[in-house]
């Protein structure tokens, strides 16, 4: 596998001072660990019709979606005072296809069909995931906020200050399609086009709509993944309790998410706090110049205008 990766086109990100390298495989850019996971899943993963995928482009609301899905499916075992989310960060509650293949396969053998998260492009999903009619939840977000969140996440991982990591260079690379799991627009287009062919197995959630009024989206999510709320639960405020438990304010205040590590056993473990920066929409306005805004808006219209998805 490493021998194959060595032969691929590669790009060292200039805004990260060459501390982060991406490899291009089948027209998609990925860092080495995700690429290895993709190749391995292509070879060994077999989807089950009961599997549910939580798909997203990185920094589009993945952490929040995972927390909500986990709280929804485990609410009969735990409430908002006993949930594992109080002591375990969301990424450790829902397995990632790119990194947790053995755990996912073990769950399948034990008939434990918990949601599976992924940042794969639709075309990069193992064939069985695309043909077995698994349900797919796709969360998407304003492209400008994605760029800002992506920029801060990576620069903090490689330990660079804002002054050391030029934001305009990050924007330029992103607009060239060079980003982890990029190009961004191809990621969205793949899932959107697939949803036109099989609308019954897709649920699209918009981050900004969820922030504005989370109740309808949480109800849709619960219905879609097969764990609908009963009228009694709705009257008892269970939906609101789950939303509060999974809120940025709650999760970011927990000790595990302030001082813990994600995958501490690995050489490239990440501080949990890096997954909780601001948790709001519109922060891009503090970073983008008028020229950058014009550039991004033109790109969105050109690449994604036909989808009808509001991404700017």
From Swiss-Prot:
Q: In which tissues is it expressed?
A: Highest in shoot tips and lowest in mature leaves and roots.
Q: Where mainly located?
A: cytoplasm
Spans traversing the lipid bilayer: none
Task: State its location(s).
Answer: Cytoplasm
What does the entry list as the binding residues for 3'-phosphoadenylyl sulfate? 59-64, 141, 149, 207, 277-279
GO cellular component terms given for this protein: cytoplasm
Q: Which Pfam families match?
A: Sulfotransfer_1 (PF00685)
Protein keywords: Cytoplasm, Transferase
According to its UniProt record, the EC number is: 2.8.2.-
Kindly indicate where the leader peptide sits in this chain.
Answer: none
Q: What class of enzyme is it?
A: transferase
Q: What SUPFAM superfamilies is this protein classified in?
A: P-loop containing nucleoside triphosphate hydrolases (SSF52540)
> What is the active site of this protein?
119
Question: What molecular function terms (GO) are annotated for this protein?
Answer: sulfotransferase activity
**Highest rank taxon of the organism:** Eukaryota
Record function comment = Sulfotransferase that utilizes 3'-phospho-5'-adenylyl sulfate (PAPS) as sulfonate donor to catalyze the sulfate conjugation of quercetin, rhamnetin and isorhamnetin but not kaempferol. O-sulfation of position 3 of flavonol. May play a role in auxin transport.
Q: Which family does it belong to?
A: Belongs to the sulfotransferase 1 family.
What this protein is called in its record is Flavonol 3-sulfotransferase
In which organism is this protein found? Flaveria bidentis
Taxonomic lineage per UniProt?
Eukaryota, Viridiplantae, Streptophyta, Embryophyta, Tracheophyta
